[in-house]
Regions:
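Short phosphate-coordinating micro-motif centered on Lys-Gly-acidic
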Residues: 36-41
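Glycine- and acidic-residue-biased ligand/ion/polar-headgroup-sensing regions
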Residues: 44, 48-55, 72-73
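Cyclic nucleotide-binding regulatory module and flanking cytosolic helices
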Residues: 1-26, 81
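Cyclic-nucleotide recognition modules
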Residues: 65-124
């Protein structure tokens, strides 16, 4: 996905503001298995994903519990770092070889102060993430595992080809056996 499209999907910026943001955002590549962020460490980076797939997870009872997937067009960063200048609680691992656009969190904050359009872009992004978090919370609290699976497939149509079933079942909060039953039921 092109960086212009990624930026505009969040909030359309005037060309001068977009160029100011792009001047600070080089393209980087990392291999499958690379961790963009590690739990309990403060990070100085903010990423926009051009190509690839990743998951965010925490450890609970020595098991990885996935709570979010990222794909092309998504912004990736620990909320605690970006908004509270604290270490994040999550690990974010690439599930495929990936191409990203990398931006320093300090530089992003400087751009927020220097350009009202970029500040509004950041605000719109934060609003969008709050809505996503609320939807995820409601899904986890009130939807069945079948409904959560259907939502996941609607949001990530190619996820079964890109993500191991163990990670998908972790995200859904079910066993791989239960995931297999759900998949068999809706085929």
């Amino acid at each position: 996905m092109d960086i212009y499209d990624i930026i505009d999907n969040i909030y359309k910026l005037p060309l001068a503001s977009k160029e100011a943001l792009l001047n600070e955002t080089p393209e980087v590549t990392y291999p499958k298995g690379f961790h963009l962020f590690l739990a309990n460490r403060k990070s100085s980076k903010f990423y926009l994903m051009k190509k690839g797939m990743l998951h965010a997870y925490i450890y609970k009872s020595d098991k990885k519990v996935t709570f979010w997937f990222g794909k092309e067009g998504d912004a990736i960063f620990p909320l605690q770092t970006l908004y509270n200048n604290q270490a994040g609680y999550e690990n974010i691992e690439l599930l495929e070889d990936s191409v990203l656009y990398e931006l320093s969190v300090d530089k992003l904050h400087d751009l927020y102060l220097a350009d009202i359009h970029i500040a509004n872009w950041g605000r719109k992004f934060a609003e969008r993430e709050c809505i996503k978090s609320e939807q995820l919370f409601i899904s986890r609290q009130f939807k069945t595992s079948l409904e959560r699976y259907q939502d996941l497939i609607a949001d990530y149509p190619d996820i079964l080809q890109r993500v191991p079933l163990g990670i998908i079942s972790s995200y859904l909060g079910i066993s791989q056996v239960s995931l297999s039953r759900i998949r068999a039921k809706i085929r």
